[in-house]
Amino acid sequence: MILPKVRDPRFVTIRRGGTLTDSEHQLLALWAASCAEHVLDLFESAKPSDPRPRHAVEQARAWARGEITMSQSRTAAGHAMGAARDLSGAARHAAYAAGQAAAVAHVAAHEAAQSARRW
């Protein structure tokens, strides 16, 4: 399970009863994309012709800028997760990090959970 049963209100948008503002949500997505980008080369060295994780990072940033919908970012997240499935080790986790970054548009707590797992 990625998310806890009781969600921290700091990672729930105001529209859903939490305290996370839209600007904070966008900032969280940008931070998640930046974190994922730092390790993306670990995936790309294993699968250099697979663009899905890098595309997910780009989509996370595009969502934060208001250029795409949440659904588009979430779709990119799913594709990045798919890229991770047949890998192991650092390459797999780098693809997952990219997917989680794009998933922040859907649920802000995704990146918080992934960051906690990495450290």
List where the protein language model places each region.
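Structured binding/interaction patches within domain cores
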Residues: 1-119
